[in-house]
């Protein structure tokens, strides 16, 4: 029997059911074996237009909300449990758009399976014509009671809007250090969460995600709790492969002021992240352990890149850009 690759975790498995391994069927689809989508991207676009006025999911990337009807995932305006993102239609602003869905899938798996960061469950799924799309399970609903969690992104928590901080508010209004202060203020287990947040920031740096702005980090309170927690990681992508970024290596500044090292090199290095760790009270021993982990885990990252559905060109770019960032951190 031929080995096949799971569209959820990229595991090689002879016993896939409709392209998914048993673990992903349980975790991503709550035990339901999903059929391939019953519509293609053309129909997706029509459905998106029909539902856009009523859907509650935000962001600029084309997406729709899905829910199960028996074993079929169908578009819905309300109470959807999944978000579907197709390959974008080329408009000249995005390069290599055919790799975007699989790029996001790979980036999320690196976060979840290698860095062990709490990360939204996700996978790839086939349209009716076989084209792959990215699918992620919503984490803002209780799976047993179906109650929606109280969730607020960091822009909302800090009261940052286009009116208060201008059109580019998601990027210009604050630093990652300011975000860490929000975690310290609102999250009860802030010591653990600060280390989690540090790992998220350095992962975004390594994978060249230049769009990790303040709306891509959120706090939520679960249905039976008054405590706030960092939500699982979401919206991860090597953006540099798709956009010629002109404004630096990260979506927002790491610190409130540039270090002498940054001013000398023009990019963030080991010293900048060491300073960041100090300012957020991450113990030196934990910082050292994370940096050692990054160095030791590169082979796992490379294996996952090779197993992914990225094009050969995208795989090479992802590896080289990741290694370049490691060199900046004095790790390779």
Predicted regions and their residues:
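C-terminal catalytic region of ATP-dependent kinase domains
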Residues: 1-8, 96-99, 112-114, 123-129, ...
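Charged, low-complexity, helix/coiled-coil-prone segments
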Residues: 37-58, 118-119, 137-147, 208-222, ...
């Amino acid at each position: 029997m031929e080995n096949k690759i799971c569209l959820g975790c990229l595991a090689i498995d002879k016993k896939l059911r409709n392209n998914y391994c048993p673990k992903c069927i349980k975790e991503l689809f709550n035990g339901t074996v999903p059929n391939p989508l019953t519509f293609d991207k053309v129909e997706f676009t029509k459905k998106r237009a029909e539902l856009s006025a009523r859907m509650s999911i935000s962001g600029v990337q084309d997406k729709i909300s899905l829910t199960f009807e028996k074993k079929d995932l169908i578009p819905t305006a309300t109470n959807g449990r999944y978000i579907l993102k197709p390959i974008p239609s080329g408009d000249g602003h995005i390069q290599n758009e055919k790799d975007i869905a699989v790029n996001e899938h790979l980036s999320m798996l690196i976060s979840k399976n290698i860095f062990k960061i709490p990360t939204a469950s996700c996978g790839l799924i086939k349209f009716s014509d076989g084209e792959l799309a990215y699918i992620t399970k919503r984490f803002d609903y209780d799976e047993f009671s179906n109650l929606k969690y109280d969730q607020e992104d960091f822009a909302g928590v800090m009261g940052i809007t286009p009116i208060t901080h201008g059109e580019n508010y998601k990027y210009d209004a604050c630093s990652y250090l300011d975000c860490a202060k929000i975690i310290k203020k609102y999250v009860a287990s802030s010591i653990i969460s600060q280390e989690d947040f540090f790992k998220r920031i350095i992962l975004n740096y390594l994978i060249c995600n230049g769009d990790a702005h303040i709306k891509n980090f959120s706090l939520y309170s679960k249905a039976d709790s008054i405590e706030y927690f960092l939500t699982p990681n979401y919206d991860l992508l090597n953006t540099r492969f798709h956009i010629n970024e002109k404004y630096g290596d990260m979506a927002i500044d790491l610190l409130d002021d540039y270090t002498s090292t940054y001013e000398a090199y023009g990019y963030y290095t080991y010293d900048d992240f060491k300073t960041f760790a100090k300012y957020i009270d991450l113990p030196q021993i934990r910082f050292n352990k994370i940096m050692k982990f990054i160095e030791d885990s590169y082979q796992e990252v490379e294996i996952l890149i090779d197993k992914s559905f990225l094009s050969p060109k995208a795989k090479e770019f992802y590896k080289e850009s990741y290694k370049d960032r490691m060199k900046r951190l004095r790790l390779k």
